[in-house]
């Protein structure tokens, strides 16, 4: 789980801790293909041969199944649960956002420049670039604000995307996020840090 953002919390009525780890898998096909990182097959299999699991860029929701021989046994259910793709993600928050007793999921995401955008870098690779034009070309790297994701816990190990319904679909470049009951009314607020924009509550 190097270089990845994660949180631990029980997502169901159980004493076993589950955890979520977020990565950079885009939800829509265009962004997914344009920003797909290059795969190095030799490095991929070398990593597997060293005893690590297959490495893919998508979120994982590790469901704590049971304890076997004093060790926890987990299953990745992110695709089944509907939360595997939330773009360039940073701050996963598992909290009861609608006060129904079940943990919902908020994921902040965004990057100021699409540094993996293959279309852009293929295009400029065909041009001669002078040293003094590097800043210019860097400033032209595509930049697309996207909405954060909010998922309601369906109480059956699946989640529904309620970002728009709950009014949490502003497009921006978010990273850090926390939750707190700022006004002591029993409902949680979400505080989000945005790049080149004001923070949001």
Please annotate each region the language model reported.
Residues 68-82, 157-168:
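Blade-edge beta-strand/turn elements of extracellular beta-propeller
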Residues 26-53, 111-142:
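Short, conserved, GDST-rich strand-edge loop motifs in beta-rich repeat architectures
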Residues 14, 100, 104, 185:
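Acidic carboxylate motifs that coordinate Ca2+ or other divalent cations, activating on Asp/Glu
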Residues 57-65, 147-153:
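Beta-propeller blade signature
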């Amino acid at each position: 789980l190097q270089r990845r953002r994660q949180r631990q919390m029980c997502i169901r009525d159980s004493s076993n801790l589950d955890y979520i780890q977020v990565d950079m898998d885009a939800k829509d096909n265009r962004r997914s293909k344009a920003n797909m990182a290059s795969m190095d097959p030799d490095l991929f299999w070398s990593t597997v041969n060293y005893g690590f699991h297959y490495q893919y860029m998508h979120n994982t929701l590790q469901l704590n199944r049971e304890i076997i021989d004093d060790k926890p046994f987990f299953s990745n259910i992110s695709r089944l649960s509907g939360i595997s793709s939330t773009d360039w993600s940073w701050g996963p928050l598992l909290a009861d956002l609608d006060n129904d007793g079940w943990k919902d999921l908020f994921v902040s995401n965004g990057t100021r420049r699409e540094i993996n955008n293959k279309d852009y870098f293929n295009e400029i690779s065909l041009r001669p670039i002078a040293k003094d034009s590097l800043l210019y070309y860097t400033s032209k790297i595509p930049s697309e604000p996207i909405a954060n994701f909010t998922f309601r816990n369906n109480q059956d190990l699946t989640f529904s995307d309620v970002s728009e319904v709950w009014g949490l679909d502003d497009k921006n470049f978010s990273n850090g996020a926390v939750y707190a009951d700022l006004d002591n009314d029993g409902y949680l607020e979400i505080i989000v840090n945005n790049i080149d924009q004001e923070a949001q509550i």
